[in-house]
Amino acid sequence: MKASSYLIPTAKEDPQDAVVASHKLMMRAGLIRKSAAGLYSYLPLGLRVLRKIEGIVRKEMDKAGGLEFQLPILTPSEIWKESGRWDKMGKEMFRLKDRHDNESCLGPTHEESFCVLVKPMVRSYKDLPINVYQIHTKFRDEIRPRFGVIRSREFTMKDAYSFHLDDESLDKTYQTMRKTYRRIFAGMGLTTIPVQADSGNMGGSASEEFMVVSPIGEETLTICPSCHYSGNIEKTPVIVNRNATKQVFDGKGKLHTPAKKSITEVAEFLNTKEENLLKAVAVVADGQYILVFLEGDRELNENKLKNHLGCNELRPMGPAEMEKLGLVPGFIGPGFPKSESLKIYIDALLDWNFSYIAGGNEIDHHIAGVQLTSIFKEEEVTKIDISQAKVGDPCPSCGTGLTAEKGIEVGHIFKLGQKYSKAFDITVLNDKGKATTTTMGCYGIGVNRCMATVIEQCNDEKGIFWPVSIAPFTVCLVSIAKNPDDIAKIETIYKSLVESGIEVLWDDRDLGPGFKFKDSELIGFPIRITLGKGFLEKNEITILDRKSMAEDTLVYTTNEELVTHLKLKISQLEETIEKEVSLAGT
């Protein structure tokens, strides 16, 4: 491809609304353009990268036995109501009505659609297992689209769904997909960590997210440096360490704490640690009033509580609701009014024999020396793990102190179980002729997000340096010749590269060499060959490795010699990727 007949709309300055490297560089390198909030158009260079990522996903999915489909983006409300998710999906779902007043949505995911499609096609255990997938457009009305294509309202997803006779078969496919995902991400140059995760609205018995460690990540990962346990902080169990010693607050009875409502303010005022305070959090779950008690240095893990309750909505209790129940905001403690309408949950981390500082049930007052046994009978309350894990907590596997990292989620796999199979009555006859409900798995990859995440990992002050497997072009040929005879000579080299199968972009634009160099470094072609004065005088070319910015020179005698040299260099880059893929699949 010649740059003079291609579209390369690069820019020197970062877009004003871009805050992360991938968003800035995708815009500056001419890969995408913003159409509206959370909506992006892919330009030719960007689309080449996207298609290569899709190709890696497709190749590995097919190798793992996946069967590719393409379903409608527009899905009828009936199937969502049948699964019970029409209301659960909330405002993130784009909903619309046609001219006949029929409700539909733009699919944010396709469990329901695939269930309806597959159901009449699987009748016997001999038809299972089956793993179906598509690489298609999805829509989610994100409340705050951000970071360019990392969190957008329209995106490309690879979503796969497997159907099985039993859990043993599901587990086998789940493990196959786990390895397949590691290979997929390694194939595009990403280093991922699989972490235990919350299943959310998807439901099911287990799930794992594939995370890329990054300071811009929206998720927090808990990682054990000893046994390599890893989990999303929303899912990580908090292990009780009764051997840890606490510094007991020296005092008992009523304390005046003027204008001190937050845990931090009270702890500082009383010169004690936050863990010595008893925190009360008042929430409403699907209309049910709930009061949660935690140690003062802990945060409520809303996902854990929602999963325990099985609720759709969890929100803070409002001032009027608290007043109605006789609760004093910021000062809830012993003697608060108990009622049938208020359920109590106690975090499992709380020590029933420890003397805490609790709210005094009146403004500007707390009480020291409070034990849980003085407030509750254990049979009156529910004790569960509902606090957020934090750095230093014991690893749930080996007890070593946990560390934390920020991460970007690029993939998610689920054991869905029979949630959707039962909703849609997907049954097959087993080997004894008895009707058996199938069990399911679900496996998703955010294709656009992968592209941006690669850039987050592969950039420097000059721009992007693409892994060879997904680069828009493998080689950028930069020439400075203007003499027709010299240009004709370069043309023969260009044709030799193209005919050999090398993906090459010849920057033949009528621009200065400095401009061309900056563009090639910004866009991030893995290899750049420069045909300058040395080429015109003695067939000498300069070869640049974009990632390391290392240069070497080659004096060649024939075009075939040049092609052979470049192919060797490209194969070395490819072998590095292939080695990572091979290791990831073990």
Swiss-Prot record:
- In short, the EC number is 6.1.1.15
Any one GO BP annotation for this protein: prolyl-tRNA aminoacylation
Reaction it catalyzes: tRNA(Pro) + L-proline + ATP = L-prolyl-tRNA(Pro) + AMP + diphosphate
- Extract one GO molecular function annotation from the record: proline-tRNA ligase activity
The UniProt entry, under SUPFAM superfamilies, shows: Class II aaRS ABD-related (SSF52954), Class II aaRS and biotin synthetases (SSF55681), YbaK/ProRS associated domain (SSF55826)
Q: Name one Pfam family in it.
A: tRNA_edit
Q: Where is the protein found, in the record's own terms?
A: Cytoplasm
Where is this protein primarily located?
cytoplasm
Q: Name one GO cellular component term.
A: cytosol
What keywords are assigned to this protein?
Answer: Aminoacyl-tRNA synthetase, ATP-binding, Cytoplasm, Ligase, Nucleotide-binding, Protein biosynthesis
**Classification via CDD domains:** ProRS_anticodon_short, ProRS_core_prok
Concerning PANTHER family, the annotation shows: MITOCHONDRIAL RIBOSOME PROTEIN L39/PROLYL-TRNA LIGASE FAMILY MEMBER, PROLINE--TRNA LIGASE
The domain comment in this protein's record states: Consists of three domains: the N-terminal catalytic domain, the editing domain and the C-terminal anticodon-binding domain.
UniProt subunit comment: Homodimer.
Its family remark reads: Belongs to the class-II aminoacyl-tRNA synthetase family. ProS type 1 subfamily.
Q: What does this protein's UniProt record list under function? A: Catalyzes the attachment of proline to tRNA(Pro) in a two-step reaction: proline is first activated by ATP to form Pro-AMP and then transferred to the acceptor end of tRNA(Pro). As ProRS can inadvertently accommodate and process non-cognate amino acids such as alanine and cysteine, to avoid such errors it has two additional distinct editing activities against alanine. One activity is designated as 'pretransfer' editing and involves the tRNA(Pro)-independent hydrolysis of activated Ala-AMP.
Instruction: Name the chain's protein.
Output: Proline--tRNA ligase
The coding gene here is proS
